[in-house]
A protein has these predicted regions:
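NTP-handling and nucleic-acid-processing catalytic cores
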Residues: 1-86, 134
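Residue patterns forming the tRNA-binding/recognition surfaces of aminoacyl-tRNA synthetases
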Residues: 53, 57-142
């Protein structure tokens, strides 16, 4: 899996793959265990996933990404809200992360993923995350 927002890991509800992607077809309907939280989530098929983009597997976090919200709604997944209104982790995350600022937590999550051997590559990329023009905070779909 690849992600531009590792801090949303605890809000993942499934992994989506394109049903035409031969690499992942045999995994549709199976489950994976998320690192750190050890929560099992299903692998689903959805044509939204671009086979050519990234790994071709998309972590779906409906409460914290607008495209993921659409996928989650389509497949009847309930969004898991992991941030409070101040951008701090709430009680839907492991205890050691609760009340941590989402941006500060990003570094801790990357560090923890590396410690347990679940980090393969770290690179800076440009991506779009919507910010409020008045609040200058990340806009979440929930």
């Amino acid at each position: 899996m690849a992600t531009t927002r590792p801090e949303t890991l605890f809000g993942d509800v499934c992994i989506a793959v394109n049903p035409s992607d031969k690499r992942y077809k045999k995994y549709i309907g199976k489950k994976v265990v998320l690192p750190i939280s050890n929560k099992a989530i299903p692998i689903i098929a959805d044509k939204y996933v671009d086979i050519e983009k990234g790994t071709g597997a998309l972590k779906v976090t409906p409460a914290h990404d607008f495209n993921d919200y659409k996928i989650g709604k389509k497949h009847k997944f309930k969004p898991i809200i992991i941030f409070d209104k101040k951008g701090k982790f709430n009680d839907n995350v492991p205890d050691s992360y609760q009340q941590m600022d989402r941006i500060e937590a990003r570094d801790k999550i990357i560090e923890d993923l590396n410690k347990i051997g679940n980090l393969q590559k770290l690179e800076n990329i440009k991506h779009f995350v919507p910010y409020g023009d008045r609040s200058n905070t990340i806009i979440e779909p929930y």
